[in-house]
A protein has these predicted regions:
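Class I S-adenosyl-L-methionine
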Residues: 1-24, 34, 262-271, 276-282
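SAM cofactor-binding core of SAM-dependent methyltransferases
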Residues: 35-114, 158
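Short His-Asn-centered micro-motif
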Residues: 42-43, 67, 178-180, 197, ...
Length: 287
C-alpha cells in the first residue's frame, strides 16, 4: 500500500552517483550563463544540477534533454517519470526482503538470459535497490555489463524514499530522457542552448581511474573526442560547461577555454580511506 506523501518543494537525485554534484552546486551555478535557451546534460548520472535548476525555476519554459549511455540508469529515470507509484510499491517489497542473500539474488538478475524481459519497473527497482544498499553507493559493471559491486554494511538503508521519488517524477514530466551517447547532443543543441558535460573524470593517477559506469570505457581517447564535441558546440554558439579532474592533460587540452578551480569533498569512493577534499576544474566557453 502506498502512503500519502507530500511532494517536497525542493528536488534532488533519487540515486547516489560517483562524482555527483550536490556538494558543488554552490560553486557551479554561479558559472552558468544568466540566460540560455534549452538545457542539455549528456552525462546525466544522478542529475544533481538538473534537479537544482528545476527547483530554482531556471528551466521553466525550456526544453530539457537528459542523456546517458547507461541503459539501466535511463530506464530508472523513465520509470520515475512515468510510473512512480508502481516503483514505490515494488521498492517497498525489496525493502521488506532486504538481506545479504536477497541482495546477491537481485544483483544476479543481469546474469540471466531473460533479464531484459523483466518489466521496466522491476529493472528500475533493482537498480535503485542496489544503488541504496551496495558498497559506498558505487555503480560498477564488468565487461559483460554485469553489476559486480558487493553489498554495503548499512544498518538501515533508505531504499524507498517516497518524497524524493515523487518530487523527481514531477520534475521529469516534460523532460526528454534518452539512452544515447553524449555525442548525440550535436543533433539537438543549437545557438544559445546550455550544455553541461559531467563525464567520467580523467584519472589523477594511473591507479585512480574509475570509468566503469557502463560497459563502455572512457579513457584518454574518449576525453579527446569529448574535447572535439565541446569545440564544435562552442563554434555554433552554445554555452558549454564541463566538470573534470584537475590534471595537466585536461587543462592543456582546454587551454583555449576558461578554466576555474573548485573544491570537492568526495564521499563515494571504492577506497573509503582515500576520501577527502580535492580540487576539480570547471571549463567553460565564453559566449
Amino acid at each position: 500500500m502506498t502512503k500519502t506523501v507530500e511532494i517536497k518543494k525542493t528536488f534532488q537525485p533519487f540515486v547516489k552517483w560517483v562524482g555527483g554534484k550536490r556538494g558543488l552546486l554552490s560553486q557551479i551555478i554561479p558559472l552558468l550563463p544568466e540566460k540560455f535557451n534549452n538545457y542539455f546534460e549528456p552525462f546525466v548520472g544522478g542529475g544533481a544540477l538538473f534537479f537544482e535548476l528545476y527547483s530554482k525555476g531556471l528551466l521553466k519554459n525550456k526544453e530539457v534533454f537528459l542523456f546517458d549511455i547507461n541503459s539501466e540508469l535511463i530506464n530508472a529515470y523513465n520509470v520515475v517519470k512515468k510510473y512512480p507509484t508502481k516503483l514505490i510499491n515494488e521498492l517497498e517489497t525489496f525493502k521488506q526482503n532486504h538481506s545479504k542473500e536477497f541482495y546477491y539474488e537481485i544483483r544476479a538478475w543481469d546474469r540471466e538470459n531473460d533479464f531484459l524481459q523483466r518489466s521496466d519497473v522491476q529493472r528500475a527497482s533493482r537498480f535503485i535497490y542496489l544503488n541504496k544498499t551496495c558498497f559506498n553507493g558505487l555503480y560498477r559493471v564488468n565487461k559483460n555489463n554485469q553489476n559486480n559491486v558487493p553489498m554495503g554494511s548499512y544498518k538501515n538503508p533508505n531504499i524507498c524514499d517516497y518524497s524524493v521519488i515523487l518530487s523527481a517524477s514531477q520534475a521529469l514530466q516534460n523532460v526528454n530522457i534518452l539512452n544515447v551517447s553524449y555525442k548525440e547532443v550535436l543533433k539537438y543543441a543549437s545557438k544559445d542552448d546550455l550544455v553541461y558535460f559531467d563525464p567520467p573524470y580523467f584519472p589523477l593517477t594511473q591507479t585512480a581511474s574509475f570509468t566503469s559506469y557502463s560497459e563502455f570505457e572512457f579513457l584518454e581517447k574518449e576525453q579527446i573526442e569529448l574535447f572535439e564535441i565541446f569545440k564544435n558546440l562552442s563554434k555554433i554558439g552554445c554555452n558549454v560547461i564541463q566538470s573534470n579532474s584537475d590534471t595537466e592533460f585536461i587543462k592543456d587540452l582546454y587551454k583555449d577555454f576558461e578554466i576555474k578551480e573548485i573544491f570537492a569533498n568526495r564521499f563515494i569512493n571504492s577506497k573509503s580511506d582515500s576520501r577527502g577534499k580535492i580540487s576539480e576544474i570547471v571549463i567553460r566557453n565564453q559566449i
